[in-house]
Amino acid sequence: MKKPLLLTLLCMILAGCDNPKSLESFTPEMASYSNEFDFDPLRGPVRDFSQTLMSENGEVAKQVTGTLSQEGCFDTLELHDLENNTGLALVLDANYYRDAQTLEKKVQLQGKCQLAALPSAGVTWETDDNGFVVSATGKEMKVEYRYDSEGYPLGKTTINSQNTLSVTAKPSADPRKKLDYTAVSRVDDRQVGNVTQSCEYDTYANPVDCRLVIVDESVKPAVSHHYTIKNRNDYS
């Protein structure tokens, strides 16, 4: 038997030399939390991660860090928006997330560890039969979320008494490059912005380094903002 054919058969037996890990879908918790807290969803046995958004000047604009249990629940989740001087640090405690500093109950959970309610803001979340958060309802607004067949978030629509804001994302056709996407933002029927992201990936098809371009079309001429995202993904 010729060596090239032998190597080909060995690769087939070993499930692919260049594709050592099969793709996993995004869990309901990962997809829903990424939607609500604005970070890139990950798949596979992630146990510890960070995502750092950096401006063209090399300054940190936003950072998200988290740890996950074997069951895929977020044990901790910390978010810092340095551009707007806001932040949040949550720690899991039974059916709630508490503020990591004050220990005040912040987020109520349902099921295994899915979002249920944010009592202080009067917000409740609803899930579909697969456990994905599909809507959030508050006193003066409602948000509807969309996903593809793998659980990848495809955007959301926010409706209030004044207008309707929609974000529609289109990921790459390559299933291993879901975080290569374009997205369009609209207020009512008027396009106000677009986003393009491209990434390098690890063997779990999770992003490692990304380039993000945000275009603000609400002003004339439109203004582009360029960012890089540094990702750290640790697995069990």
Model regions and ranges:
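Sec-dependent bacterial lipoprotein signal peptides
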Residues: M1-A15
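Buried hydrophobic residues that stabilize the cores of well-folded domains
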Residues: C17-S236
